[in-house]
Design a protein with these regions (language model features):
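Divalent metal-coordination and catalytic microenvironments
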Residues: 49, 67, 88, 99, ...
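Histidine-rich, glycine-flanked metal-binding segment
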Residues: 34-93
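Metal-associated gating/positioning segment near the N- to mid-region
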Residues: 86-154
Length: 296
């Protein structure tokens, strides 16, 4: 789901038409037309700004109508309901942050849709995609609609939601996809409860999401390796910050990434590995991409 972050004027774009995290549907700025002067009346014109395009740096006017960039003018511009003079400024597109934890509902004192999206806007992020591990987790249509209602009233930027997969029944995943969930997420560590998935369920959900044209995001760590190493850390009395690194070895991530890549290849599912930290994981990602597999 992707929505305008304005409570008084909400637009909904189904995920089939707009995948913020899918590399299959990327707008190529090189294809934007350099429009001639015309008599159109549009919503917004940002004039005299510097724009960095694939062809080089261009000074001109950005023409926006109905929420979309419709062209670039090098000299004059059409009439507009709002004109922004960007003389001396660089015009940049708003960034999309597809991995956001706003903790709302459940723990709004940590961060909620207002405080989180206010910070996003200040940093140039104009679309946030919220993760499912809130309380309740976004694993049912009821929880999805609850979070949507909260975001409608608080969000200052555009937003979308990732549904939880884990061991969630497939009928619920289908309902979430139909409601507009942009993607789904599973964890490979048991402490994430209903968001954690066995290998069998991981494969079955990948097959379903391939049919639904939704990516699966994975927190990829070998839970057994992590748990046993953490037991060693406690037994050794280590409490320093580096203990977290020493007792969470690269192989725990690398093995899980390889497992996910293998299952996703079998299911023909778009796989997205979240927050990779090991060089060996990057090597596996590059190898999978070189074979033509859709993994990011």
């Amino acid at each position: 789901m992707y929505q305008r972050g304005y409570p008084d004027k909400v637009k909904v774009y189904q995920a089939r038409d707009y995948h913020p995290i899918s590399l299959r549907k990327v707008i190529n700025p090189a294809r934007l037309p350099i429009l001639p002067c015309n008599t159109l009346t549009v919503d917004i014109v940002i004039k005299n700004g510097l724009m960095v395009l694939p062809s080089g740096i261009t000074q001109g006017s950005l023409v926006i109508d109905d929420g979309k960039i419709i062209g670039i003018l090098k000299s004059s511009e059409p009439k507009a309901d709002r004109v922004i003079d960007a003389t001396g400024k660089v015009v940049l597109p708003g960034m999309i942050d597809m991995h956001v934890h706003l903790r709302d509902p459940g723990f709004p004192e940590r961060e909620d849709f207002e405080s989180g999206t206010r910070a996003a806007a200040a940093g140039g992020v104009t679309t946030v995609i919220d993760m499912p591990n809130t309380v309740p987790a976004t694993v049912t249509l009821e929880a999805f609609n609850q979070k949507k209602a909260i975001a409608n009233g608080k969000s200052l930027v555009d937003f979308g939601f990732i549904g939880g997969a884990g061991e969630v029944p497939q009928k619920d995943i289908i309902e979430l996809a139909q409601a507009g969930a942009t993607a789904f997420k599973s964890f490979l560590i048991a402490r994430f409860k209903e968001l954690a998935a066995s290998d069998y369920t991981l494969l079955k959900h990948m097959q379903l999401l391939s049919e639904l044209d939704r990516p699966l995001l994975v927190h990829a760590e070998n839970g057994d390796i992590v748990d046993k190493y953490m037991e060693e850390a406690v037994a050794s009395g280590r409490t320093d910050p580096l203990a977290h690194c020493d007792f969470r070895p690269d192989i725990a991530e690398i093995e899980a990434v390889m497992r996910c890549i293998t299952l996703a290849a079998e299911a023909d599912c778009h796989l997205h590995i979240c927050h990779m930290s090991a060089g060996g994981s990057v090597d596996l990602l590059e190898w999978a991409q070189s074979t033509g597999q859709l993994v990011t």
